[in-house]
Design a protein with these regions (language model features):
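His/Asp/Glu-rich mid-to-C-terminal helical/loop segments that flank catalytic regions of hydrolases
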Residues: 274-304
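Active-site rim beta-loop-alpha module in soluble metabolic enzymes
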Residues: 195-240
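Non-catalytic positions within long, well-ordered alpha-helices that form the structural scaffold/packing
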Residues: 148-149, 239, 258
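Metabolite-binding pocket within alpha/beta catalytic cores that recognizes anionic/polar moieties
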Residues: 48-195, 199-203
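Zn-dependent metallopeptidase/amidohydrolase metal-coordination segment
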Residues: 251-285
């Protein structure tokens, strides 16, 4: 079980208490490496501090130093997951499929909200990881970062999106780039307005949909943290900029994957409509696409 709530991250080891140089260990003074070596000396700390790109707005500040205090695989250093992964915003449909496929549970990622089983599926000569994704960029990126750190390097995600134009429900879309209107991606990559998704994975998704004779469109998606702050003027503005869909994770997941050296792509299916800003249409939230979207992700993995 991976439980970040129970790891005792605030306690120092006896080795840290006995710091050389004749003084107490301090979080503000030194970082004690995991290999037991000496803390960073003052000159080294100064050099690392230079890696922080500072800005008046905190969201635009970025630390290019990849040595995090808490590594993504914290507590599961020995876990080795398959290279291929389906990471799906499909709720119980993921667990249902895992049960039908007689999947095994390699690990359980625990959070205060719910636990996420990490399934291993063996199907048609392929072994892949299957995991349900939590709603929202911070939670989704945290779990995907964990999966990558444990071995997943080719990740196909799927989930619903709202539409800003006149698109029918349950249509499939392939995001080419995502507008970074969330906060999480800025912790993985320096600031930019958009992030492009991996072309090789996009091509594999397009090939799979073409082979199965499934209509699709490419799209520019608007990734936002503010579900209830999709204002009328902002919807118009994003639409004028070229965004045709809105969701809450794509930009963050693409940034996380790029930072960690993984390949990531996503299949979106249309749910509610914001095309008429005076009358939001929930429709059926794209529920008719859940199973097909999951099957398409698995089919894409067969080609990469």
């Amino acid at each position: 079980m991976i439980n970040l709530m129970k790891q005792g991250l605030g306690h120092r080891t006896p080795q840290q208490e006995a710091v050389p140089w004749g003084r107490k260990f301090s979080r503000m003074d030194n970082f004690w490496p995991r290999d037991g070596s000496c803390p960073l000396r003052f000159s080294e700390r100064i050099e690392r501090a230079k890696m922080i790109q500072k800005h008046e707005l905190p969201i635009l500040e970025y630390d290019s130093n990849s040595e995090e205090v808490i590594r993504p695989n914290h507590g599961a250093e020995q876990l080795k997951l398959p290279e291929k992964c389906v990471y799906a915003f499909l709720g119980e449909a993921v667990d249902d499929y895992a049960f039908e496929a007689e999947a095994t549970v390699a690990e359980t990622f625990e959070t205060i909200t719910r636990n996420y089983p990490v399934y291993i599926v063996k199907q048609d000569g392929m072994e892949f990881c299957l995991c349900a994704a939590p709603l929202g960029a911070p939670a989704a990126a945290q779990l995907m970062d964990f999966l990558i750190s444990c071995g997943c390097k080719k990740i196909i995600s799927t989930g619903s999106c709202g539409v800003l134009t006149d698109l029918a429900e349950n249509e499939f879309l392939i995001p080419v780039k995502a507008l970074r209107d969330e906060g999480t991606s800025y912790h993985y990559l320096p600031a930019s307005r958009y992030i492009e998704l991996n072309k090789n994975i996009r091509d594999a998704i397009e090939h799979t949909l073409l082979v199965q004779n499934i209509p699709f469109q490419e799209c520019v998606t608007w990734t936002t943290d503010g579900f209830f702050r999709e204002t009328q003027d902002m919807v118009r503005y994003r639409g004028a900029e070229g965004c045709t869909t809105v969701e809450m994770e794509c930009a963050a997941l693409a940034a996380c994957a790029r930072k960690r050296g993984a390949s990531f792509g996503q299949i979106l299916y249309t749910a509610d409509s914001l095309a008429n800003i005076d009358a939001h249409d929930e429709r059926d939230w794209g529920k008719g696409s859940l199973r097909k979207a999951l099957e398409l992700c698995i089919a894409v993995l067969q080609t990469i």
